[in-house]
């Protein structure tokens, strides 16, 4: 990019933000009684030089991301034709034509190859107001059009909802191979899958550190379950703490503590320790089985599974182990609780009398339960929340093979994000991208 071009883009960004963009900004309020998806057109992106194919892929992924969010009614690009004479400056945009096809929002972009990777210049317009409201220059390393698209979609969501987007986040999961267990990550929509670890011993229960720098897993490398941490910066895989028969570790929201389970003889209790593995102490001392801790977003409470009532049920207690109370009273086999980052819901898996597994959510305060899946295969399990608490991902066999599905918090919109059969298990949604 030339110096003149960079200065022009900076001036344009100042011109459209923040004052102009703040005027009568159309805000999407999810969950409001009058919510409706916002109609938006994502025009064909312009590829500069040899970036034509990358521009096409970027636009396609942006459209798919916005559809997956459930916040937008993304108009079919076959319903409108590109106008070669239409530029990017607001005076050149034929807003009346875009209004005629039903668009309230319009996204356009230039994509080019920069010195270190792809660059995208995103432009967003409010069609009814006839103005440009956002311009953003985004860069990604290498030729990763998908990552560029996810960042663009995040910017669009941020403008309309005033909340961070979650498309640039990653999902961790365990994949079983022939005699191997792999720790893998992928984009939240199933793309860009990468293998981080391949072990000949069992791997289970991945859990992200809140800053995204490490993933905690349960490893059987020593022949017994132990907590190990994978570090992205140097790909180190190291044991954490001194407990054998420790499993299911999860970081506290501030990353300073880890709650986990220890099985000693016939006793299975919850423990907590500092993030470096020091200072471990018991949280529960009960003859029952206590497993699967999950933190409230403020770090003050922990939900977990216990069979102290005779069957596995969800309980909530203080983060110091005090005041445990039963939360679920429906069903006789409830497991894998996951506390929403918004704090209002806990997702979990329940098994019914037919041995069918489904996903539910429960209010941690009132105990009110809502069903997310029903009659959608025999297995819907292991829910994990997106960092915005509006979406979750879980494992399902509804189409004849194991898949990962993204759902909203009500279960109204459920979208497979893996194609065909997959052996992925224990999906864990990672934190917001830096």
From Swiss-Prot:
InterPro entries: 6-blade_b-propeller_TolB-like, PD40, Tol-Pal_TolB, TolB_N. SUPFAM superfamilies: TolB, N-terminal domain (SSF52964), Tricorn protease N-terminal domain (SSF69304). Residues 1-21 form the signal peptide. Pfam families: PD40, TolB_N. The keyword DNA damage does not apply. It is found in: Periplasm. GO terms for biological process: cell division; protein import. GO terms for cellular component: periplasmic space. Gene3D superfamilies: TolB, C-terminal domain (2.120.10.30), TolB, N-terminal domain (3.40.50.10070). Keywords: Cell cycle, Cell division, Periplasm, Signal. Residues 411-434 are annotated as: Disordered. Belongs to the TolB family. Part of the Tol-Pal system, which plays a role in outer membrane invagination during cell division and is important for maintaining outer membrane integrity. The Tol-Pal system is composed of five core proteins: the inner membrane proteins TolA, TolQ and TolR, the periplasmic protein TolB and the outer membrane protein Pal. They form a network linking the inner and outer membranes and the peptidoglycan layer. NCBIfam families: propeller_TolB. PANTHER family: PROTEIN TOLB, PROTEIN TOLB HOMOLOG. This is Tol-Pal system protein TolB.
